[in-house]
Amino acid sequence: MPQTQKPDFPGNDLGDQFRFWPKHNEKIYERLENKHAWLEEKRAAAQGDGKPPATQRSEVDPLENEMILNIGPQHPATHGVLRCVVKMDGETIEKSVLDIGYLHRGIEKLAEHKTYQEFMPYTDRMDYLSPYSNNVAWCLAVEKLADIEVPERAQWIRMIMSELARISSHCLWLGVGMMDAGAVSGFVWTFQEREEIYSIMDEVAGARFTVSHSRIGGVANDFSPRAIEMIRDFVDTFPDRIAGWEGLLNKNRIWVERNKGVGRVTKEEALELGLTGPNLRGSGVPYDVRRFEPYLKYDEVDFTIPVREEGDCLARYFLRLDEMKQSVRIIEQCLDRMTEGPIRSDDAKEAYPSKEEVYYSMEGMIHDFMYTDVGTVPPKGAHSYHAIEGPKGELGFYLTSDGTGRPWRVRINAPSFTNLQAMEHMLEGEMVADTVVIIGSLDPVMGEADK
């Protein structure tokens, strides 16, 4: 049967005008049908006089030229819609450029068209791996702007839930980090602990993921006896899980070699690049908002700030494990010190009334209607900035009021956006295979970075 001639690759007839792959217009072999013959000729030359075959002889080897590679935005290892364009010499990265904004939704502008309470669910969708931390950061900023006092029990509840959110975020980071390095089973192990935390969130807030449990002036629901029991059971067993992960990874040769000395950032570079959170402390800077600018009840509990001096991916791994241990300490102290009392402000202009008041009293129904319609009204011209120590770093909200129930301006200090600014520096001189490990060690969430 006669063979039909296949058409040339689109653009072959354009010659030098075809620039889809710069410097790759050379024909390594004449046609696809000659591929096997070319490989055999190359093997024969390697066993003979060492000279390359005639079809391969060229002054420039295409494989030794500089190459431009797109990593993302549709790539599972970029932890979201992150695009990184790298210039390589062989497999070594000479330069990289980040291209972000693929998940931009205009959250700051949306906030200006919502009441302060209506914007709460939008914060869940920023860092969607630790939504409770976003809720608390927003509430604290509004409460500072409007000078709202939060009951003590509500502050303890917020602390406990925020630390559970931190553990949940770090568990996902560790599982994904192991999978990025080739250990797929580790992803499943860390999700067992996340599932326990989701069950606690469901019991407390009625939702597993985007909880929206914190409220301006307090929290939506109090802890039930079952919720407290579930939290105590979790903090009793979780340290053993951490010890199991340490036994699995701390001396694992593959894990250590994939992370040690990779993506290194010195203390001076970390400060210049604006790193925050675990990435900053992993480079030797002991800064934690919970200690230096305490909020809620963090100044009443005892905990240490983990710090590592190496500044590489392995240091960031050790630091996040230590952070989870400290979160367990904080939760245990919160449970012991939490007293009975109200969970929301009793001022009808500052917080929603309870459901019992809404259902069984005319005043409660009116207050609920007015707060939903108007919301919190800070003084005109007031402005404030409040930050918390989220799982990714310093998460802050800057608010400006025009005297209405909606903010005049909202500015979000997102740690994922801040940390990504250091990535171009971290990738320089690294192997392209280490790109996914470096991205994972920064732990970015693109919903928060792009806003």
From Swiss-Prot:
<keyword id="KW-1003">Cell membrane</keyword>
<keyword id="KW-0813">Transport</keyword>
<dbReference type="GO" id="GO:0005886">
    <property type="term" value="C:plasma membrane"/>
</dbReference>
<dbReference type="InterPro" id="IPR014029">
    <property type="entry name" value="NADH_UbQ_OxRdtase_49kDa_CS"/>
</dbReference>
<comment type="function">
    <text>NDH-1 shuttles electrons from NADH, via FMN and iron-sulfur (Fe-S) centers, to quinones in the respiratory chain. The immediate electron acceptor for the enzyme in this species is believed to be a menaquinone. Couples the redox reaction to proton translocation (for every two electrons transferred, four hydrogen ions are translocated across the cytoplasmic membrane), and thus conserves the redox energy in a proton gradient.</text>
</comment>
<dbReference type="GO" id="GO:0048038">
    <property type="term" value="F:quinone binding"/>
</dbReference>
<keyword id="KW-0472">Membrane</keyword>
<dbReference type="GO" id="GO:0050136">
    <property type="term" value="F:NADH:ubiquinone reductase (non-electrogenic) activity"/>
</dbReference>
<dbReference type="InterPro" id="IPR001135">
    <property type="entry name" value="NADH_Q_OxRdtase_suD"/>
</dbReference>
<keyword id="KW-1278">Translocase</keyword>
<comment type="subunit">
    <text>NDH-1 is composed of 14 different subunits. Subunits NuoB, C, D, E, F, and G constitute the peripheral sector of the complex.</text>
</comment>
<dbReference type="Pfam" id="PF00346">
    <property type="entry name" value="Complex1_49kDa"/>
</dbReference>
<dbReference type="InterPro" id="IPR029014">
    <property type="entry name" value="NiFe-Hase_large"/>
</dbReference>
<keyword id="KW-0997">Cell inner membrane</keyword>
<keyword id="KW-0520">NAD</keyword>
<comment type="similarity">
    <text>Belongs to the complex I 49 kDa subunit family.</text>
</comment>
<keyword id="KW-0874">Quinone</keyword>
<dbReference type="InterPro" id="IPR022885">
    <property type="entry name" value="NDH1_su_D/H"/>
</dbReference>
<dbReference type="GO" id="GO:0051287">
    <property type="term" value="F:NAD binding"/>
</dbReference>
<protein>
    <recommendedName>
        <fullName>NADH-quinone oxidoreductase subunit D</fullName>
        <ecNumber>7.1.1.-</ecNumber>
    </recommendedName>
</protein>
